[in-house]
Amino acid sequence: MKKLLLAASIIYFASVSLAEEKTTPFISNSDTKIKLEGFYLFESGYIKQDHLILFDKNVTDNRKKLGFDTEVAFAATITKTIDDVIAGAKIVLQPTTKAKTTASYNGSHIFIETSYGKVELGSPVDASAQLRVTGNKVTAGTGGWYRYALLDGQYMRYNALKPDFDTSVNFYLESYSNSFDQVNEKTEKARRLNFFTPKMKGFQAGISYTPDTANTGGNKNINNLTLQSSGRNGISASRTGIKTLSIANGEIMTINQNIRDAFSAGLTYEHAISEDADLKLSMTGEYGKPARRLIHAKVDGTTKAIEVLNTYKLSNLKAYNLGAVFTYGNFSCGASYGNLGKSLTAKEYYKVGRNTYYYNGAVAYGQGPIKTSLAYLKTSRYKNTVNAVSLATEYKIMPGLLPYAEISHFQAKGKPVYYPEAPSKTTRGTVGLIGTKLKF
């Protein structure tokens, strides 16, 4: 705890000494404008969790319990207006290795906006992610306890196979983002075509198309899939959106959860009920076809040759999310529910369960520069569950500078989805976060 307090002091005094109250800078030349914006988040996390073995106890390579985390983004939006048409480009730089910022920093892309709507070319974030509403919209802090927790450690495994868990609603913001829990390191998400209608009487809609979610910005080659044997059912050596699992007797399962011809859409409605009351509703969905089949193969222990034993069809992606946020005076509350059904699963491997869903809710109260919130999250992935409660508070020192503190308690219960005979195991823990967000 002393180390956590020391880290908090460093964050606070460094932020106060460096931050200045500024407005977002604009560079304007007649009909051409450049808008510069960005943010920096620094966070220290302390965790206490049961049933961790050996190096599972390490938050970082060489430290237990305490770790630091950062998120950084810088964006420049260049626009040119001719008559009633606005054309421009948004260029986003993320110095850290993982793309983990919010949808408002939705990556570099070209856009064209008219009175009929807005088209985004090459955006890595789809329409459903940008229009989706969750309970976390009203919370203080970051809700990032899952960055420090380890839910699939050695104690939770069976025959060396890990259980699958979801730890935040962010999974549903990118349910086909080329990975199983988060975007792969040093890669961006696949490029998309987005269209958004203008807001009309509180309503706004959007739709996106993604030809291939394996076509990420970080791939060296256009053909991301390097096959060790030819044919559509060949074993892929790719790392993007694919994992290979050892089951028994030298047998493996290769699961490719990339999607082709993916469509996503969303509809939001905002309404000012009175001078002090506002309501926002959202309904979003995603649909797509699996790029490849689940592959059951055997690896020769001597020659390492791969023999394909069988292939199985994965279910289509079918996902939806419902969300609402209500604000009255200083009080806010939000709730959301998301469901992926049996998306991208096959009964030959997902023997324990195939359905995935989540729900969450949050309440918040703000008075002057102080905001406090309480949030609850429940997820179920293949019958493996996570429950988490988070209490957070933040204090606005000046516009753009926001220190925060947060404490979360979580519980995960489950087993590897391939082994229905495995016992369900439980791990619990508490995470404390102290950090500062600087936005300009």
UniProtKB/Swiss-Prot annotation:
Residue runs in coiled coils: none
GO molecular function: porin activity
Signal peptide boundaries: 1-19
Any GO CC annotation of this UniProt entry: membrane
SUPFAM superfamilies attached to this UniProt entry: Porins
InterPro entries (alphabetical): Gram_neg_porin_domain (IPR033900), Porin_dom_sf (IPR023614)
Pfam family, one: Porin_4
Keywords for this protein: Signal
Protein name, per record: Uncharacterized protein RT0064
